[in-house]
Amino acid sequence: MMSGVMTAVSNRWDPGVIRALAEARHGDAFAVLGAHRTDTGRVLRTYLPGAERVSAVLDDGQTIALEAGPEPGLFAGDLPAQGGYRLRIGWPGGEQDTADPYAFGPQLSDFDLHLISEGHHLQLADALGANVVEVDGVRGTRFAVWAPNASRVAVVGDFNSWDARRHPMRLRHQSGVWELFVPDVGPGAHYKYQLRGPHGHELPAKADPVARRAELAPGTASIVADPTPYQWSDDGWMATRARRQAHDAPMSVYEMHAGSWLREEGVDLDWDGLADHLIPYVADMGFTHVELMPVTEHPFGGSWGYQPLGLFAPTARFGTPDGFARFVDRCHREGIGVIVDWVPAHFPTDAHGLAHFDGTALYEHADPREGFHRDWNTLIYNHGRREVSGFLIASAMEFLQRYHVDGLRVDAVASMLYRDYSRNAGEWVPNIHGGRENYETIAFLRRLNALVREHTPGAVMIAEESTAFPGVTADVAHGGLGFHYKWNMGWMHDTLHYASLDPIYRRYHHGELTFSMVYAYSERFVLPISHDEVVHGKGSLLGRMPGDDWQRFANLRAYLGFMFTHPGRKLLFMGCEFGQPTEWNHDSGLPWHLLDDPRHRGVQTLVRDVNRLYVQYPALHAHDDDPSGFAWVVGDDAGNSVVAFLRKGKRGDAPVLVVINFTPVVQHGYRIGVPQGGQWREVFNSDAGIYGGANLGNGGIVTAEQQSMHGHAHALPLLLPPLGAIVLTPPG
């Protein structure tokens, strides 16, 4: 109940302050706005462009009408020395009662600011960004952004008509963080930051680097996220994840692009629709994991997510952050792990993003020899800056902890490790010892992987690293980078080149098939047939295979049989599992209609069966990283383009014999030495009729004869199907 209305005369406004406020240049709004002590009480100043009148409503109900100042939107009045107040603002469209943003003290704790400055705040989005909070009984949103070289920062949004004069922020000087609590702003509000550089020049409005939600492209605003925690139902998965993802467990990864896996009438599915269709398919196909191409927010869909700007926000292209959480949750409930591609190497130059964020090279290197990547027209993160490396590590933790993601595949690691990557002499800056290694990135990756192991046990870190940099998967304590796995790019390049050759020439390239075993145990590897191999004019996996249709499909089936029995975890890009004949196009859905063709359906059936074989037999996965788990039986038959090897599991596990004929010639009576006699069972044959083959094989059973061969006391007389892979297991 109001007890009365008083009018008071405000203190005089300084003309310089008026001009700075009106031009959105004043860098210390808290020194002017809000209530400030005077000799007789307090003076209250507000700047609300567009307001027609403003009153202060005191805690006792008394209302004090503020006087309009010399500039439209300026209002001031005298208040008693003690007591709280609210603002009653008369806008052209009606009245608003609200708390004054400039009545609140500093928001972030000194400890938070210290952690941010040191790059040690692992829950960075709980401090920076937009967080819905309650302060002194008032509900609103705390905005905070790191911009140490800015001379002024304001938050603009749909709650203040995107007016940079309305909500200038407070600088916490020791950290370079600007903050402001804005009452009554809640989830769903769209916002950006309007900054001025160190010399006062206005910068393009910036999206929040730490926003947990972003506007759907082509919009570029950040959105205040709902603070309600997602209610997870994957306790069983999380409790067993470390065992499921141990080095001796099977890992078969289905790599996919969420926007083009399945399109209904040309429309992308949201996370829930994708889960409805994808999860049953992946489970039926026998993959243990899905790997999503980057889901962090990115402005250009044609980058496939590899040029992200919103490293804390799942892209809005497929729904809300909770939608992404539901997708992961549903995968886990069906026993499927989720790996996400993550890009800490570089970022695009879009004006609303991180580029020259506060008018200086803040996130990137200032020197283009270090900070600009010509191949991708992107800017390179300065991993040597504590706040930047901390920002990236916190992004990784956000997805691993908040979204229960089971692993990150770190993109473009080689481009980070070497200062001369894709640069000519004179175009790069050596390290302090004159070398090419990027010591700052090495330190960043080691710290990242050590923290992931410490704080998210059971999660895996996978490096896309294409060079011979030593110790990528070695422990940090032993001088390594600390990744769990590394993509085996050498295996992929060699074997795809071999498979693309006309069989008549393969005898001259036999080493491309066998060389991978020379270094197979130097790292812990994933065998990647990824999206990179079916784009940019390379053709599809099926399209790389030589010969007529029969030979191409047989080649593909044999190659997949080789891949799934070779040491190393498996990764197969979507569409390859049924022999997509054309390159992948992110603007189109996969050609699922091809499954009406028995040849394509046969490839799909083969992948389903070989996945189950891989999981069922420990010999095919338990010793991927141990030389005792592999033995050549026939590695030198270049003339016949045949390889044969034994895969061995732990003590008590049955060995598995793999034989592959990479020529279109049937091999009759091909003898293979084996470690024991009796009847060996043919458990897989890529030439089976169900896969689209000619059903040439060994009838399911082959009896080993007592004959010394290949270092063994027994031998199997085999029929090797043309362009075929067979797998046999011993008796017992």
From Swiss-Prot:
<dbReference type="Pfam" id="PF02922">
    <property type="entry name" value="CBM_48"/>
</dbReference>
<dbReference type="Pfam" id="PF00128">
    <property type="entry name" value="Alpha-amylase"/>
</dbReference>
<dbReference type="InterPro" id="IPR004193">
    <property type="entry name" value="Glyco_hydro_13_N"/>
</dbReference>
<comment type="function">
    <text>Catalyzes the formation of the alpha-1,6-glucosidic linkages in glycogen by scission of a 1,4-alpha-linked oligosaccharide from growing alpha-1,4-glucan chains and the subsequent attachment of the oligosaccharide to the alpha-1,6 position.</text>
</comment>
<keyword id="KW-0119">Carbohydrate metabolism</keyword>
<dbReference type="Pfam" id="PF22019">
    <property type="entry name" value="GlgB_N"/>
</dbReference>
<keyword id="KW-0808">Transferase</keyword>
<dbReference type="GO" id="GO:0003844">
    <property type="term" value="F:1,4-alpha-glucan branching enzyme activity"/>
</dbReference>
<keyword id="KW-0328">Glycosyltransferase</keyword>
<dbReference type="InterPro" id="IPR014756">
    <property type="entry name" value="Ig_E-set"/>
</dbReference>
<dbReference type="InterPro" id="IPR037439">
    <property type="entry name" value="Branching_enzy"/>
</dbReference>
<dbReference type="InterPro" id="IPR006047">
    <property type="entry name" value="Glyco_hydro_13_cat_dom"/>
</dbReference>
<dbReference type="GO" id="GO:0005829">
    <property type="term" value="C:cytosol"/>
</dbReference>
<dbReference type="GO" id="GO:0043169">
    <property type="term" value="F:cation binding"/>
</dbReference>
<keyword id="KW-0321">Glycogen metabolism</keyword>
<feature type="active site" description="Nucleophile">
    <location>
        <position position="411"/>
    </location>
</feature>
<feature type="active site" description="Proton donor">
    <location>
        <position position="464"/>
    </location>
</feature>
<dbReference type="InterPro" id="IPR054169">
    <property type="entry name" value="GlgB_N"/>
</dbReference>
<dbReference type="InterPro" id="IPR013783">
    <property type="entry name" value="Ig-like_fold"/>
</dbReference>
<dbReference type="Pfam" id="PF02806">
    <property type="entry name" value="Alpha-amylase_C"/>
</dbReference>
<dbReference type="InterPro" id="IPR006407">
    <property type="entry name" value="GlgB"/>
</dbReference>
<dbReference type="GO" id="GO:0004553">
    <property type="term" value="F:hydrolase activity, hydrolyzing O-glycosyl compounds"/>
</dbReference>
<keyword id="KW-0320">Glycogen biosynthesis</keyword>
<comment type="subunit">
    <text>Monomer.</text>
</comment>
<dbReference type="GO" id="GO:0005978">
    <property type="term" value="P:glycogen biosynthetic process"/>
</dbReference>
<comment type="pathway">
    <text>Glycan biosynthesis; glycogen biosynthesis.</text>
</comment>
<dbReference type="InterPro" id="IPR044143">
    <property type="entry name" value="GlgB_N_E_set_prok"/>
</dbReference>
<dbReference type="InterPro" id="IPR006048">
    <property type="entry name" value="A-amylase/branching_C"/>
</dbReference>
<dbReference type="InterPro" id="IPR017853">
    <property type="entry name" value="Glycoside_hydrolase_SF"/>
</dbReference>
<comment type="similarity">
    <text>Belongs to the glycosyl hydrolase 13 family. GlgB subfamily.</text>
</comment>
<dbReference type="InterPro" id="IPR013780">
    <property type="entry name" value="Glyco_hydro_b"/>
</dbReference>
<protein>
    <recommendedName>
        <fullName>1,4-alpha-glucan branching enzyme GlgB 1</fullName>
        <ecNumber>2.4.1.18</ecNumber>
    </recommendedName>
</protein>
